[in-house]
């Protein structure tokens, strides 16, 4: 059974293990811990093990910005990122939700499109030669 919940400090090591798997180091440890402390980190679990996580904040022009959407490499293409996004569509503190990914990350672009996000713009010069594409969706009204 898959469930999505807010992360707690007890989850930090499992979350970091996934992040290290993906980026190769624990450079985001403090960022992730801070997100957990602010209740801005959610996890997707299946059979009591954490398969992915999402962090967000509301500092993007006052709107929710999904900053990290990370799924364990061996658990991808199974709907876990979509479960995290779906949770945010129901629980976002703001009506508008933004996120972004590199132009080279076609898999994440497909996830955004499959979840109803629209392309909203592009930022050059963050990663040399690999523009950042901004995506946007409006939270469904209750």
Describe the residue ranges of each PLM region.
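Short beta-strand element of the conserved SAM-dependent methyltransferase core
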Residues: 42-45, 133-138
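Conserved acetyl-CoA-binding loop-helix of GNAT-fold acetyltransferases
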Residues: 71, 77-90, 110, 114
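Alpha-helical hairpin
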Residues: 4-7, 80
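Conserved catalytic-core motifs of GNAT/GCN5-like acyltransferases
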Residues: 98-100, 116-134
């Amino acid at each position: 059974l898959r469930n999505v919940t807010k992360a707690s400090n007890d989850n930090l090591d499992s979350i970091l293990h996934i992040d290290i798997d993906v980026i190769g180091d624990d450079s985001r440890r403090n960022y992730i811990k801070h997100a957990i402390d602010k209740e801005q980190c959610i996890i997707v679990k299946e059979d009591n093990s954490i398969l992915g996580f999402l962090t967000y904040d509301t500092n993007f022009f006052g709107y929710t910005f999904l900053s990290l959407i990370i799924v364990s490499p061996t658990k991808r293409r199974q709907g876990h990122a979509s479960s995290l996004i779906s949770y945010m569509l129901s629980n976002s503190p703001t009506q508008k939700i933004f996120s972004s990914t590199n132009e080279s990350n076609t898999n994440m672009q497909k996830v955004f499109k499959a979840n109803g996000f629209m392309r909203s713009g592009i930022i050059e010069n963050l990663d040399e030669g690999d523009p950042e594409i901004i995506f946007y969706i409006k939270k469904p009204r209750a």
